[in-house]
Swiss-Prot record:
PANTHER family: TRNA(MET) CYTIDINE ACETATE LIGASE (PTHR37825:SF1). InterPro entries: Rossmann-like_a/b/a_fold, tRNA(Met)_cyd_acetate_ligase. This is tRNA(Met) cytidine acetate ligase. GO terms for molecular function: ATP binding; ligase activity, forming carbon-nitrogen bonds; tRNA binding. It holds the Pfam family HIGH_NTase1. ATP binds at residues 6-19, 100, 157, 182. Keywords: ATP-binding, Cytoplasm, Ligase, Nucleotide-binding, RNA-binding, tRNA processing, tRNA-binding. Gene3D superfamilies: HUPs. Its EC number is 6.3.4.-. The gene is tmcAL. One of its GO terms (biological process) is tRNA modification.
Length: 298
């Protein structure tokens, strides 16, 4: 018998230690498997530490096994990220999954997923209608779910957790899902005792501040950020035609022309802000930038 945790550990911090200890207490004797993103994470960024370094510290703090989630899933939107993670958990014959959640109501996740499954054709119709209106996929999906069930999830870990549960329900996986309350808001700019969000810890690391109160990971020098590669990205965009850019993964619907139009922006953040729109979320733009830098094509 085993239980899985899906994680990025970007970086591994006290909240993750709490989660592993919580699992050990609630599920004694169960082997803990971590499904961990590799060197790149879901938002299209470079992980703050290598996969091997994050794997090592997870094992040191109580995980029994760490499995790498393939790049093609780890660097994608929530529904694709969840698809890859749950397929891996199922292939490993792990029978339980646990995740952090803002609402912490697993029965609601399951019930809503079942309603959507029973009304899948109607859901797909609403989804297509919303996409035609120019909405991003996450927004279009949320509104389609809301129209069918009367409910939708707004908080990031609820959204991701719901995608996990949907994969279990839609694929009839023999996996039982559990959730628990998070120790801290994922992007809070304020710590709570010994806990701080991954976003805040990364910010502190890049500012050269001491983070030892919040994470056991040691950072002797500032990690490379995707922002540091903006000049390389600019060079590629300048040297490629719009037609050539369309060969890269996720580049479609004219986004290559927006990239060409705004490539003179002075910084990575300025560029993302200019290209960001109702249809193109900042997360999607960041993933495309990563794919272009890595040469990932369709």
């Amino acid at each position: 018998m085993a239980i899985a945790i899906i994680a990025e550990y970007n970086p591994f911090h006290n909240g993750h230690i709490y989660q592993i200890n919580y699992v050990k207490e609630k599920f004694p004797g169960e082997k803990i498997h971590i499904i961990l993103s590799g060197n790149y994470v879901q938002r299209g960024e470079i992980a703050i530490a290598s996969f091997e370094k994050r794997k090592k510290i997870a094992l040191e703090y109580g995980a029994d096994y760490v499995h790498e989630l393939e790049f093609e899933y780890a660097s994608q939107a929530a529904h694709i990220f969840a698809k890859g993670a749950l397929a891996k958990i199922n292939s490993l014959q792990i029978d339980k999954l646990i995740f952090g959640s803002e609402t912490n109501d697993i029965n609601e996740f399951i019930n809503i997923a079942k309603i959507i499954k029973d009304n899948k054709s109607q859901y797909q119709l609403f989804l297509k209608e919303n996409l035609k209106k120019g909405l991003s996929f996450p927004k279009a999906s949320s509104l389609a779910s809301q129209k069918i069930t009367g409910k939708y999830f707004q908080m990031p870990n609820d959204i991701l957790g719901f995608e996990y549960v949907k994969q279990i329900i839609f694929n009839n996986y023999k996996i039982t899902a559990f959730c628990h309350t998070r120790t801290n808001d994922y992007k809070s700019d304020k710590p709570s005792g010994k806990y701080a969000s991954s976003t805040l810890i990364r910010k502190m690391i890049f500012e050269g501040k001491d983070v030892s109160k919040y994470t056991p990971m040691i950072f002797e020098k500032k990690p490379i950020r995707i922002e540091d590669l903006y000049f390389d990205f600019q060079t590629i965009i300048f040297n490629k035609t719009a037609q050539e850019l369309r060969q890269f993964k996720l580049v479609s619907e004219g986004i290559e022309n927006l990239f060409k139009k705004h490539i003179n922006e002075k910084s990575y953040d300025d560029f993302v802000a200019k290209v960001n729109s109702k249809r193109y979320t900042s997360s999607r733009i960041k993933r495309i930038i990563l794919y272009i830098l890595l040469g990932i094509k369709n």
